[in-house]
Amino acid sequence: GPMFGLFLHDGGVSFATIFCYALGSCMLGFLSASLVKTPYKPPVKREPISLDRFILLKGMPAGLSLLLLSIPYGMTTNYVAMYAREIGIHTQTGFFFTFMAIGMAISRIFSGKLVDRGKITQVIAAGLYLVVVSFFLLASCVYLIQWNDTACTILFFGIALLMGIGFGIMFPAFNTLFVNLAPNNQRGTATSTYLTSWDVGIGIGMLTGGYIAEICSFDKAYLFGACLTVVSAVYFKLKVTPHYHKNKLR
C-alpha cells in the first residue's frame, strides 16, 4: 500500500486520485469479505462481560514489548519517505517498501519452521536484534549521506530488507506466543490482544514521530524509535521470556 501510494505520488498523481484508489481497494476488500461463507453456528450463552473477554491478561507483558516495537514501525510506514527527502535521498522511496516486502517474504522461508519446533522466544529475540540494528542504521543515514550519497542510498534500501526480515520473523512468532498463553476458549482473545498491541503502537508512532520531527528532525524521531526497540528487546529478554515459559499452556 505505501509503495503503490508513493509511486503514484512521485508520478504526479494528485492526492484526490490516490485516495480514490485507496477507496476502491477498500470497496474490493469489503466485497470479497461479504462473499465469504461460513457454517451457521447457533448462539451460545455468554458469561458476564469482563476484562479478560477482550484482553488476554497473561499476554500483557508480551503486549507491552510488542507495543514498544510497533511505535518505530508506525514512524517508518508514515514518515520514511519524508525522512529520505529531508536527508537528500532522491530515488524512488517506494522501493523501500518493496525491499521490506521482499525481506518479509524471505523470513517466511525459515521462521515458520523454527516456530513449529517450539523456538518461539528465540525467533522473536533474533528478529528483535535485526530490528534494533536496522533502526539505528536508519537514524544514522543523516550522517552517512554526507560521506557518500550512493553508499547511503544502497544502505537505505538494505535497511528496508533487514527490517522486513526482522519484522517478518517476529509477526508469526508473536502471534503463536499469545495463542500459547491462552486456553482454547480464549484463542480469539489472544489474537485480539496481539493485534491491539500492534495497532496501538502504530498509532502512537504516528503521533510521536510527527511531533518529534516537528520540533527536531526525522532522524531524531528514528533515533527515539531505535531506543524503544532496545527497551523492547531488553524487556522481552528479562520479563517476557521467563513469563512465557512459566505460563504457556502448549
For each feature predicted by the language model, list its residue ranges.
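Loop-to-transmembrane helix entry/capping segments in MFS-fold secondary transporters
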Residues: 90-91, 184-194
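C-terminal transmembrane helical hairpin of 12-TM major facilitator-type secondary transporters
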Residues: 118-174
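C-terminal membrane-cytosol helix-exit motif in multi-pass small-molecule transporters
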Residues: 23-42, 235-240
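Helix-to-loop junctions at the C-terminal end of transmembrane segments
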Residues: 9, 107-120, 213
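Helix-loop boundary and gating motifs at the non-cytosolic
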Residues: 59-66, 70-89, 96
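Juxtamembrane intracellular "pre-TM" segments in multi-pass secondary transporters
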Residues: 36-66
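Small-residue (Gly/Pro/Ala) motifs that create kinks and tight helix-helix packing interfaces
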Residues: 1-9, 81, 204-213
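Helix-loop-helix hairpin linking two adjacent transmembrane segments in secondary transporters
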Residues: 1-34
